[in-house]
Amino acid sequence: MPNIFEPHFDEPREHPGFDCRRARIGRQAGAERLGASVWEVPPGQAAYPYHFHYAEEELLFVLAGRPSLRTPEGWRELAPGDAVAFPVGERGAHQLVNRGEDAVRLLVVSPAGVPEICVYPDSGKVGIYDRAPIEGLRELYRRGDAVDYYEGEEPPAV
């Protein structure tokens, strides 16, 4: 049985500045339409790039540490026990950074099982993701690479 205080981290993320670990607690518990993840972010690292979602609202709980939260309103420090909601769309944009000396632990809850589109404003990317139980599609593009709806399409023979 999964435990948020002793999680089995099943998704390491290793990229300079974004090293962290994720335990997909919801999936480990057998949830199909509800996601819950414990994130552990070492000092000097970010959990993920600044982004917002089009389909998934998120609810974040700080379990340990004092992460810095970036939103459209700016930066602020969170404390253990704080809860923050990130609605869909630009107003829900967020990023968590550990500027402290101890590891940060977060619990994030969101819907699962729906395709998701994420926008990364700092890098001008858009991500398209399938979610469990389907999974498979995970692609990122520069927003400037957009093409016309009909590009490459030929009308059917009549």
Per-region residue spans from a language model:
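Short, conserved beta-strand element in jelly-roll/cupin
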Residues: 38-42, 53-71, 109-113
